[in-house]
Amino acid sequence: MCSEFYTKDEVMTVLNDHNVTHLYHANTVRTACSYLVHKGLFSRQEMEARGYPQTAQSSDRIDIKYGIYNDIFFDSCDIHKRAHNANQYGPVLFVFSNKVIYEACHIAITRKNPIYGRNSFQLNENEHYFTNIEDLR
């Protein structure tokens, strides 16, 4: 896991400066139903540990290998809408207030979607994450 690069307040300021009022998490119907039944948004690792039903992802093995299987990813926009197409993560979209970041124990912002180039996660964290708040502005 990467180190702490910025505070939650710094991230909130950047989100607000860019008019990002909501964060988005898309998933399959099966996984989304587990979130609803168990009243929470869980990482894939946590879902597995608790025995909650979820849809397998083609990236699971690589995510485990590179230590991101316990991470939860959000988008800063509605990818369904932006791409004018179905979201590759699934048809169910959860929309959260940007204030959800205050509930996170750790925040890291990736330079690009980790689904692309997952085999390169052996590179150093500076190549995968924004490492200072100024890079986000």
Q: How would you describe each model-predicted region?
A:
Residues 1-137:
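Active-site-proximal loop/hinge segments that shape catalytic or ion-binding/gating pockets
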